[in-house]
């Protein structure tokens, strides 16, 4: 199948290494995950090879799929304050959250010499967030 962008959003390990290579060979230049870990390890290796060779974009679920969790948190906040936000208000808040995630992930990747590598950037940004929280609470 030919596509420019693939959005695997169904199940874990939905795309294996051979399928990832086929996507790339057929012109796909971006995979943005909408499910929890829809690409297996071999697929991720294929994405990384394509990123290095041709600038392929791969946004892992841990960053790209954060929108569902964010909207759930917004809903809980809205409910606890007995508020009722419009679609536009929720969408605006979500866009801000997702832009912030992208900024943190891309900044972390660049800061540590992995510009364009959103897997490494997401891992580093996530680690920094947890480490900062532990330091702030005096756990380290």
List where the protein language model places each region:
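Rossmann-like NAD(P)-binding element
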Residues: 1-17
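Adenosine-phosphate binding glycine-rich loop
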Residues: 9, 24-140
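Histidine/acidic residue-rich metal-binding segments in metalloenzymes
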Residues: 21
